[in-house]
């Protein structure tokens, strides 16, 4: 069966990580054929440089070369990765004007951060694509899918624009999924994510009219911020809707983040029972999505971990009054770049398989 043709709109941090995840998973050219990447620049040499040298993730295991799409091209505008050719296309303010139809693209991975509204993302469909996967939380009624949690809800006939949620939701939702599936329940919960700084932040104090604290220097401050990640869990696990909220602290690390969930269970339980349930899930129905560690690890130990969420059993706490057994804290790590990017790839592969089985592709 021929690979599904994919286009990536936005070849920044996440766009590149998604592409590199395909290479690492050995699905480029077999299951997925990335025919084009879209960005403000079409300089293949610069893209190749970015892929070859990464401060956090290191050198790739695959070959990266460049070529020209035609003899008349002034500079190389084609990436050649393990022999696969990927055209570099100039970005357009209107996704409907991108040449997806001409290029035969089936799926667009929308990773610019600009077209997260469903109506705007549908421009890619007008441009000739069949489906759009947004690598961010979405608005406007786009279906939100978290792999390992609610992918079974995907409907090929009606879900043409799908959101992969946020990296933090992808970490929190698997933990909550196990707690609810194994009948611990969540009466109410507060989440904090200790989150590495990202490209949207400032290297030195700068202008940030809407978020004053967010404009402060990322590498030397702990910066309180907002996040909708906890509330978004209610979109993929309806039984928790309205029961979870949270906040974020941006901290001076370049990658890997950690979720701290304090919750009240709906029944009496214990740390030992919670540990056992999460460990079993990590080895069975959540394998590859949820991890489990009982080692004395720190954030850098999770760099390049492709799982969405790694439960830290050493960090689990309880604070119950006499006669109570329902108040707990659980902690889970995640590589907010690498793990999340792998889930984008997994989602595209999952949707592609479902679409083909239902003859939507």
From Swiss-Prot:
<comment type="subunit">
    <text>Homotetramer.</text>
</comment>
<dbReference type="GO" id="GO:0050661">
    <property type="term" value="F:NADP binding"/>
</dbReference>
<keyword id="KW-0560">Oxidoreductase</keyword>
<protein>
    <recommendedName>
        <fullName>Glyceraldehyde-3-phosphate dehydrogenase, glycosomal</fullName>
        <ecNumber>1.2.1.12</ecNumber>
    </recommendedName>
</protein>
<dbReference type="GO" id="GO:0006006">
    <property type="term" value="P:glucose metabolic process"/>
</dbReference>
<feature type="active site" description="Nucleophile">
    <location>
        <position position="167"/>
    </location>
</feature>
<feature type="short sequence motif" description="Microbody targeting signal">
    <location>
        <begin position="359"/>
        <end position="361"/>
    </location>
</feature>
<dbReference type="InterPro" id="IPR006424">
    <property type="entry name" value="Glyceraldehyde-3-P_DH_1"/>
</dbReference>
<comment type="similarity">
    <text>Belongs to the glyceraldehyde-3-phosphate dehydrogenase family.</text>
</comment>
<keyword id="KW-0520">NAD</keyword>
<dbReference type="InterPro" id="IPR020829">
    <property type="entry name" value="GlycerAld_3-P_DH_cat"/>
</dbReference>
<comment type="pathway">
    <text>Carbohydrate degradation; glycolysis; pyruvate from D-glyceraldehyde 3-phosphate: step 1/5.</text>
</comment>
<keyword id="KW-0576">Peroxisome</keyword>
<feature type="binding site">
    <location>
        <position position="93"/>
    </location>
    <ligand>
        <name>NAD(+)</name>
    </ligand>
</feature>
<keyword id="KW-0324">Glycolysis</keyword>
<feature type="binding site">
    <location>
        <begin position="227"/>
        <end position="228"/>
    </location>
    <ligand>
        <name>D-glyceraldehyde 3-phosphate</name>
    </ligand>
</feature>
<dbReference type="GO" id="GO:0004365">
    <property type="term" value="F:glyceraldehyde-3-phosphate dehydrogenase (NAD+) (phosphorylating) activity"/>
</dbReference>
<dbReference type="GO" id="GO:0006096">
    <property type="term" value="P:glycolytic process"/>
</dbReference>
<dbReference type="Pfam" id="PF02800">
    <property type="entry name" value="Gp_dh_C"/>
</dbReference>
<dbReference type="InterPro" id="IPR020828">
    <property type="entry name" value="GlycerAld_3-P_DH_NAD(P)-bd"/>
</dbReference>
<feature type="binding site">
    <location>
        <begin position="13"/>
        <end position="14"/>
    </location>
    <ligand>
        <name>NAD(+)</name>
    </ligand>
</feature>
<feature type="binding site">
    <location>
        <position position="198"/>
    </location>
    <ligand>
        <name>D-glyceraldehyde 3-phosphate</name>
    </ligand>
</feature>
<dbReference type="Pfam" id="PF00044">
    <property type="entry name" value="Gp_dh_N"/>
</dbReference>
<dbReference type="GO" id="GO:0005829">
    <property type="term" value="C:cytosol"/>
</dbReference>
<feature type="site" description="Activates thiol group during catalysis">
    <location>
        <position position="195"/>
    </location>
</feature>
<dbReference type="InterPro" id="IPR020831">
    <property type="entry name" value="GlycerAld/Erythrose_P_DH"/>
</dbReference>
<feature type="binding site">
    <location>
        <position position="250"/>
    </location>
    <ligand>
        <name>D-glyceraldehyde 3-phosphate</name>
    </ligand>
</feature>
<feature type="binding site">
    <location>
        <position position="39"/>
    </location>
    <ligand>
        <name>NAD(+)</name>
    </ligand>
</feature>
<feature type="binding site">
    <location>
        <begin position="166"/>
        <end position="168"/>
    </location>
    <ligand>
        <name>D-glyceraldehyde 3-phosphate</name>
    </ligand>
</feature>
<feature type="binding site">
    <location>
        <position position="336"/>
    </location>
    <ligand>
        <name>NAD(+)</name>
    </ligand>
</feature>
<dbReference type="InterPro" id="IPR036291">
    <property type="entry name" value="NAD(P)-bd_dom_sf"/>
</dbReference>
<keyword id="KW-0327">Glycosome</keyword>
<dbReference type="GO" id="GO:0051287">
    <property type="term" value="F:NAD binding"/>
</dbReference>
<dbReference type="InterPro" id="IPR020830">
    <property type="entry name" value="GlycerAld_3-P_DH_AS"/>
</dbReference>
<dbReference type="GO" id="GO:0020015">
    <property type="term" value="C:glycosome"/>
</dbReference>
């Amino acid at each position: 069966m021929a690979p599904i043709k994919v286009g990536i709109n936005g070849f920044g941090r996440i766009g590149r990580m998604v592409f590199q995840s395909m290479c690492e998973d050995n699905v480029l050219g077999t299951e997925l054929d990335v025919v084009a990447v879209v960005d403000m620049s079409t300089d293949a040499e610069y893209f190749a440089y970015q892929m070859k040298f990464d401060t956090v993730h290191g050198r790739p295991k695959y070959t990266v070369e460049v070529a020209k799409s035609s003899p008349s091209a002034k500079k190389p505008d084609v990436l050649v990765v393990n022999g696969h050719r990927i055209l570099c296309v100039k970005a357009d303010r209107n996704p409907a004007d991108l040449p997806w139809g001409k290029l035969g693209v089936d799926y667009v991975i929308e990773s610019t951060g600009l077209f997260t509204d469903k109506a705007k993302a549908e421009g890619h469909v007008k441009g000739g694509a069949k489906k759009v996967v947004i690598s961010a939380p979405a608005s406007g009624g786009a279906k939100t899918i978290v792999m390992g949690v609610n992918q079974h809800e995907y409907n090929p006939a009606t879900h043409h624009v799908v959101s992969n949620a946020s990296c933090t939701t992808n970490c929190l939702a698997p933990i909550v999924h196990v707690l609810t599936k194994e009948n611990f329940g969540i009466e109410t919960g507060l989440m904090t994510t200790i989150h590495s700084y990202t490209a949207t932040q400032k290297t030195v104090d700068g202008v940030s009219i809407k978020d004053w604290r967010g404009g402060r220097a990322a590498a030397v401050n702990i910066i309180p911020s907002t996040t909708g990640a906890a509330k978004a869990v209610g979109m993929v696990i309806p039984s928790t809707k309205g029961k979870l909220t949270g906040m974020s602290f941006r901290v001076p690390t370049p990658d890997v983040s950690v979720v701290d969930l304090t919750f009240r269970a709906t029944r009496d339980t214990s740390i030992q029972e919670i540990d056992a349930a999460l460990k079993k899930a990590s080895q069975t129905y959540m394998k590859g999505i949820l991890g489990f560690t009982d080692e004395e690890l720190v954030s850098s130990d999770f760099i390049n971990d492709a799982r969405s969420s790694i439960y830290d059993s050493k960090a689990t706490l309880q604070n119950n009054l006499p006669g109570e057994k329902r108040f707990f804290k659980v902690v889970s790590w995640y590589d907010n770049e690498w793990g999340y990017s792998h889930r984008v790839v997994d989602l595209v592969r999952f949707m592609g398989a479902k679409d083909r089985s239902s003859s939507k592709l």
